[in-house]
Amino acid sequence: MTKYALVGDVGGTNARLALCDIASGEISQAKTYSGLDYPSLEAVVRVYLDEHSVSVEDGCIAIACPITGDWVAMTNHTWAFSIAEMKKNLGFSHLEIINDFTAVSMAIPMLKKEHLIQFGGGEPVDGKPIAVYGAGTGLGVAHLVHVDKRWISLPGEGGHVDFAPNSEEEAMILEILRAEIGHVSAERVLSGPGLVNLYRAIVKSDNRLPENLRPKDITERALADSCIDCRRALSLFCVIMGRFGGDLALTMGTFGGVYIAGGIVPRFLEFFKASGFRGGFEDKGRFKDYVHGIPVYLIVHDNPGLLGSGAHLRQTLGHIL
């Protein structure tokens, strides 16, 4: 008889829940709920389990916020809860609450070739560290290492490191944004809101008044070639994505590969392919040769967060991935 666990991927707007076959890791019965419609994450879980008439004893839910102890307070939502109390209330034997990019990193060993698009470099080296990052509402970062038949995710808040410009144009962007917001992290330029910041700074650098555009507007105008400022912003976004990925590669020696997740890049995939992304990735001066062979992959799996939550839980329960 198949034994299932509950897995989830929760962001600031939606909660996506599914079942994971503990033996195989297969994800099924995925459903998305609006976080605005429920008073708590526990309430959403109860609704999901009732709707699917399933009894589970184990669960793992990825959440887009730092997980530093028993108390979890979501960054972009009002939900806050005790992991131990939620586990008790649901009657679970195991309940793991992990960072969203911990989940994405744990999905990597489960991905197949059709879930990846490669951007330069050679073949990944088995046993070497892996980096994963992705731009969405924010900028998520994690690393992954393989030790004694176990995958260990190394989460953090790497998206909040300083934005490090490496060209006159990027230095100009930093100067303008610093005058507006003070500290300029990488996330301030590598995210949906970050794309807007790039556009605004580019326009303001010419002493003009920027329009009130959304990330979607900037992308659409850039792809239609109807706005030179939007096209410059999107081009610069791709280059800085490359620079940041190259920094991750240098920091951990990620010869196992660098992986890009998140919902932004797939929206302009052909533009990204032709951009200066890989040039930015390898623009490391004396260490260009060091990163030259490191492969970069775009993850195109529909639900890496759910897949990785399942992998994390299965490994916790003693399965070898």
UniProtKB/Swiss-Prot annotation:
Species, as recorded: Salmonella typhimurium (strain LT2 / SGSC1412 / ATCC 700720)
Protein name: Glucokinase
Molecular function per GO: ATP binding; D-glucose binding; glucokinase activity
Source taxon at top rank: Bacteria
Signal peptide: none
One cellular component (GO) term of this entry: cytosol
Keyword Calcium: no
Keyword terms, alphabetized: ATP-binding, Cytoplasm, Glycolysis, Kinase, Nucleotide-binding, Transferase
Alphabetical list of InterPro entries matching this protein: ATPase_NBD (IPR043129), Bacterial_glucokinase (IPR050201), Glucokinase (IPR003836)
Similarity comment text for this entry: Belongs to the bacterial glucokinase family.
